[in-house]
Design a protein with these regions (language model features):
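Membrane-cytosol interface segments of multi-pass membrane proteins
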Residues: 1-175, 277-278, 282, 304-306
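Short, structured coil/loop segments at alpha-helix boundaries
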Residues: 3, 36-43, 139, 157, ...
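Short, isolated positions within intrinsically disordered regulatory regions of eukaryotic proteins
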Residues: 16, 27, 86, 100, ...
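Aromatic-anchored segments of alpha-helical transmembrane domains
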Residues: 19-26, 97-98, 172-186, 226-240, ...
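Interfacial loop-to-helix transition and helix-capping segments at the boundaries
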Residues: 46-58, 133-147, 180-198, 233-262, ...
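Specific transmembrane alpha-helix
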Residues: 58-71, 147-159, 180-213, 252-272
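Alpha-helical transmembrane segments and terminal signal-anchor/GPI-anchor hydrophobic tails
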Residues: 194-198, 204-285, 291-306
């Protein structure tokens, strides 16, 4: 497909993921339901919608970010791409974490807002500022950006491994084994590394076997891809059944969310969508502000309508 069409599809996809992130963080049944039985039923419905569908959003962001980073990548492009990510990731990460910290410092000292925020006065100290800026202490949804920054910093190592077919497949196999065994890594999440490396592997081979991602496909090609995804879903459900190979394994959750991302990519690619509007291109802003507003609206509504 043409470059403009590809970019429009990316904007549509990331906009969809942004809406799903808001959806996941909009759970509010426990704030309004008076009886435990009613609250439990509402929570069950919210869990089905949010956990089954909404949880593909962050893996999707990891994979889109990785695919774009390694699209047409070479060693000569490493420094320019790092410089670009400092502007688009690191600086906004620090700025928004600072704003959230100052917002909590201020709001917890205002009588009208302190009750809504539900925190004791947040101290303004050097240690607190460091925790807020670096460790996203007052902006929990930015764990994703923290992980993404780490992954971008590891770009040379990831590129060296994933640019080879055999080494890339072996690396993904090792990560899959680690997820199956429920292994953990210090600081970096293994599932985030798996999503990022999977997309990097495809992107680095977009001129060969990975070209199908960007190629136009007719009705027959889309139907074949949908049939493949359907078979993959059946296989995953079978392996994830009680006593199955993936039962109660983190690898099942990771594969299920990876399947969801693939389904979303196919849906956006196959759909005849109009050009992305300008406001749809500012997904970082929506991601940055949504959590505070969603929680503020929910808590304020719970106070006003007990």
């Amino acid at each position: 497909m043409e470059e403009k069409q590809f970019r429009d599809k990316v904007y549509w996809l990331t906009f969809l993921f942004s809406l799903l992130v808001v959806w996941v963080h909009s759970f509010n049944g426990e704030l309004f339901m008076g009886t435990p039985e009613a609250a439990l039923e509402v929570a069950r419905i919210e869990h089905i919608l949010g956990e089954s569908l909404g949880q593909i959003a962050v893996p999707g962001f990891f994979m889109v970010s990785s695919y774009l980073f390694y699209r047409g990548f070479s060693w000569e492009k490493l420094i320019p791409k790092w410089r670009s990510r400092v502007r688009s990731l690191v600086l906004p990460y620090l700025l928004w974490n600072f704003l959230y910290y100052m917002g909590y410092v201020t709001a917890t000292r205002l009588p009208g807002l302190a009750g809504v925020v539900g925190k004791s006065p947040v101290p303004f100290t050097g240690a607190g500022l460091f925790e807020a800026l670096v460790c996203y202490a007052y902006n929990p949804v930015f764990w994703y950006l923290f992980q993404l920054i780490l992954l971008v910093a590891l770009a040379p190592l990831i590129y060296a491994v994933m640019r080879g077919n055999a080494t890339g497949a072996a690396a993904l196999g090792i990560m899959a084994w680690g997820l199956w065994m429920n292994r953990a890594m210090p600081v970096l999440n293994l599932d985030a590394l798996f999503y990022f490396c999977t997309a990097a592997w495809v992107s680095l081979h977009r001129d060969t076997w990975g070209r199908k991602i960007e190629e136009k496909a007719g009705a027959g090609g889309n139907m074949a891809a949908a049939a493949f995804l359907l078979l993959a879903m059946v296989l995953l459900r079978y392996l994830g059944r009680p006593e199955g190979l993936l039962w109660a394994r983190p690898l099942f959750t990771v594969c299920w969310r990876l399947w969801g991302v693939c389904a979303a990519v196919l849906a956006v690619k196959a759909a005849k969508l109009p050009a992305a509007r300008e406001w749809m291109k500012h997904n970082f802003f929506l991601y940055a502000i949504h959590f505070a507003w969603v929680r503020l609206i929910n808590k304020a509504a719970a106070v006003l309508f007990p």
